[in-house]
């Protein structure tokens, strides 16, 4: 069927399903929210330019923000990339390997250990954010 096995409202890509959730949560709470949706559901991991494009177009079609709200809305969107306490390297919350990246800038402020899609570049790049910041997010599961 057309959904390729994804639940209603989720976007299929290459054997996985992506869902955008507009409620604003911290990175950890967003990951927990995704995990409660079902087995092996996590914040989204991105492994190719094509997958990134699919997520960007999903966000473009689902952004609920009107122009007037822009000042108050924190429009970056959490993905599953984080740097766990005491580790030097970035990791995806679903355990997949880091084989693609689209960082907004080089160099990472030490306190910012979670990554979000940057709305100022139409979600084409990632930036580091404080994990406690509350943002909308993308969950993903394998079909």
UniProtKB/Swiss-Prot annotation:
UniProt keyword Hydrolase present: no
Cellular localisation: Secreted, Extracellular space, Extracellular matrix
Disulphides: 6-17, 34-139, 114-131
Database matches in Pfam families: Lectin_C (PF00059)
UniProt entry keywords in alphabetical sequence: Disulfide bond, Extracellular matrix, Lectin, Phosphoprotein, Secreted
Domain spans labelled C-type lectin: 13-140
Primary subcellular site in the record, as a coarse category: secreted
Residues bearing PTM Phosphoserine: 66, 68
Alphabetized SMART domains for the sequence: CLECT (SM00034)
Gene Ontology molecular function, alphabetical: carbohydrate binding
Cellular component terms per the entry's GO annotation: extracellular region
PANTHER family: MANNOSE, PHOSPHOLIPASE, LECTIN RECEPTOR RELATED (PTHR22803)
Protein name as it appears in the record: Rheacalcin-2
Native source species: Rhea americana (Greater rhea)
